[in-house]
Amino acid sequence: MAVRIKLKPGREKSLERRHPWVFSNGIHNVKGKLEAGDTVDVVAHDGHWLGRGAWSPESQIQVRIWTFDREEEIDREFFKRRILRAQAGRDDLIREQGLTGYRLIAAESDGLPGITIDKYANVLVCQLLSMGADVWRDTIVDVLAELYPDCAIYERSDVDSRKKEGLASTMGLLHGTLPEMPVIIEENGIKIAVDVTKGHKTGFYLDQRDNRAMAARFVKGKSVLNCFCYTGTFGLYAAKAGAASIENVDVSALALDTARLNMRVNGLNDDNVHYNEADVFKLLRQYRDEGKTFDVIVLDPPKFADNKSQLNGACRGYKDINMIALQLLNPGGVLLTFSCSGLMPADLFQKIVADAALDAKREIQFIERLSQASDHPIGSAFPEGFYLKGLVARVW
């Protein structure tokens, strides 16, 4: 008999709606002997079968569901089917946008909880963030090596969230030969340098691809301030679209060096591009005090809230930085502002920016609501997959 976890009365509703998480406070009892990462069946209090997932005793999320199909076994073929399905769902996008860099597996939203896989040219980068994912590492690598024989496989599980699973951070080569860094990927006809060993996340922010392309609509002949620019790709799109001037701002000198490289690999002259190694919060206040203005400002800050207790502080931070940015925009200018925190509801983020406009004494119109690129899908039963929120505002 399979090891079985029984839920408390009434705690089956989320699984019946196919949400893939079982929290520790919803478990009534465990029947059978379990080790971390083991596959376990989950049943309702009345005994009816709900799903099959991975056991993670040290996490608040103690089971992540692999499948809601009682006949589906969790084995090598299971992972192969999931990866093939995810690839098929991205093939049209890859052809349309000429992508050599994209998210192959978006964790729960692709039916593989705790597993993120990004493809950068001939390198696959994995993040294994749950106990179940960690236990199946060798199988996942074996399947990837079969399906993508020309790719090196590199792990970037160097994230704090693994601690919640009782796992140590880890990174390194899992298969093949890693090419010299950076690798060059392409999107929408633009080349981008990515260092998968040192870059943020798995190396780059693939989720902003569509927003980079959209932002280019507003920049021809305009002055652009690109805040928290990382490797400068919003500025790169702006340069190609004919911006009059671009200022890329980031606290990392290494990121700015890559921003310069990105201009070179695209054959673009950067005489009108300024690279500013600075704290964005301090710089915006300095520019406001100096009376400096811009036509377009991009605000793409790091995550302000990792848990619910930090949300109020995040709201204050978003309001403050958006207020100052609005004060720096010329009449008719455009603000592109983002939140990458999954805890920040889209409607609340819009209200924060609206309140910032009141404090800045500026009139704004919201002309676009933005999200993550379509290779970062949002499972219908997993609203937590909707993490990137963006707004485009015309400012008067």
Swiss-Prot record:
Residues 2-79 form the PUA domain. One of its GO terms (molecular function) is rRNA (cytosine) methyltransferase activity. Transmembrane segments: none annotated. It catalyses: cytidine(1962) in 23S rRNA + S-adenosyl-L-methionine = 5-methylcytidine(1962) in 23S rRNA + S-adenosyl-L-homocysteine + H(+). InterPro entries: PUA, PUA-like_sf, PUA_sf, RLMI, RlmI-like_PUA, SAM-dep_methyl-trfase, SAM-dependent_MTases_sf. GO terms for cellular component: cytoplasm. Specifically methylates the cytosine at position 1962 (m5C1962) of 23S rRNA. Belongs to the methyltransferase superfamily. RlmI family. This is Ribosomal RNA large subunit methyltransferase I.
